[in-house]
Design a protein with these regions (language model features):
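Cytosolic, long alpha-helical scaffolding segments
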Residues: 1-214
């Protein structure tokens, strides 16, 4: 008979894709932390831009594989709009983190602010919590206490980032008021770093909404 012995095509695993994206979020965040802590000059930082972009390109590849799988897939583990939202939201974390790295180079920073080191650690912590949560997310229809606590942790880290950002910006305007260019540049840099943590929280909130939905 025709078709006998023909191997059935393996079904695409969307949860594996989410985990891969979350792992790349951690990888990009750790690169940012490394760059911030080892900073010497913007010229030296330029050498790290290809590494950051390679991670971003790898993440784009995961996105494309998800969208390609969705086209012919009639039965998906989550609603299509939820899969698309998760994929795009996770990819946004990586894009934002790469943008922070690029900004340090584009703005030609001459020194690394100590609070940037604190912020980079928060970004790593948020991404790590999200990545750990993503491992359990495939069982989101039977949410575990561990998964819930990890999502709460992401929100707690975002609260820490908000408090740090508030104090940093105030200090900039109080202590650097005679240097408006420095205030402007570092405000934009810290805003971009805070956006990374905010996006981690947005993904965690999306995960929580999906858990409630199912």
């Amino acid at each position: 008979m025709a078709g006998i012995g023909k191997k059935k095509k393996k079904k695409f695993d969307y949860y594996d894709a989410f985990e891969a994206q979350a792992a790349l979020c951690v990888k990009e965040a750790k690169l940012l932390k490394e760059i911030v802590h080892d900073f010497e000059s913007a010229a030296e930082l330029e050498k790290e831009l290809p590494r950051a972009h390679a991670i971003e390109r790898e993440a784009d590849g995961v996105c494309h594989s998800v969208f390609e799988a969705l086209l012919p897939d009639f039965v998906t583990p989550l609603d299509r709009e939820d899969i698309i939202a998760m994929t795009e939201s996770l990819d946004e974390i990586i894009d934002m983190t790469e943008e922070v790295i690029q900004n340090f180079y584009m703005f030609d920073v001459h020194f690394m602010h100590e609070d940037a080191k604190k912020f980079s650690k928060l970004i790593v912590r948020a991404c790590e919590a999200l990545s750990e949560a993503m491992v359990d997310f495939r069982n989101c229809k039977k949410a575990s206490e561990k998964l819930n606590s990890l999502l709460v942790r992401v929100n707690d880290i975002e609260d820490e980032a908000d408090a740090l950002f508030l104090n940093i910006i105030r200090e900039l305007y109080v202590e650097e008021c005679d240097n408006p260019m420095r205030v402007s540049v570092w405000t934009r840099l810290f805003e971009a770093m805070e956006d990374c943590v905010d996006q981690c929280e947005a993904v965690a909130n999306k995960m929580s909404m999906i858990m409630v939905k199912y």
